[in-house]
Amino acid sequence: DGPPPELSDHSATPIHTAKTHQDTPFETIGKGIPSQTQWEVSGKALVTDVPITYLGYVNRDTGVIEEPGHPLDGVPIKDAVLIYPKGSGSTVAPFVLMGLIYTGFGPIAIVNRDVCPLTLPAASLLGVPYAHGFRDDPTTQVNTGDEVSLTLSGGEVSLRVEARSTED
């Protein structure tokens, strides 16, 4: 009884980001995790200074971030060196990330500003290079599209921007 509800397009309020495009050389040192002793990886960076919520906001089938208002909304994480401050949300997040990695829709490496108990288990169990605790904040110093290299040796991770992107 009564008229059907009217659905309108409620565009999400953009989540605040402090990221600005960087163009100076950048290299920093961080930490690895005990389950990983040595690795080298390079690739294109996908960067945000806003936490990522895997459960409900990263499509489990495609790896595309689907969080209206998030700076990376609509962007796939597949084959990226994924750089973000930390995960957020449920303790189910590692299982979502593990599924993405297992099916080939996950990142090739994960860099967190802070050690992340929602991200670390998936990276550790499936052998995805994981780094955290950098001297300088990679979420503000690396641009999406930068070519980066990471090397873990002796528990220390070196992150270096090899080539800067021309746009963010």
Give the role of each language-model region:
Residues 25-41, 46-156:
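Feature captures the catalytic cores and cofactor-binding loops of soluble hydro-lyases/lyases
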Residues 3-25, 163-167:
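Intrinsically disordered, low-complexity terminal tails and inter-domain linkers enriched
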Residues 155-163:
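Generic recognition of long tandem-repeat/solenoid scaffolds
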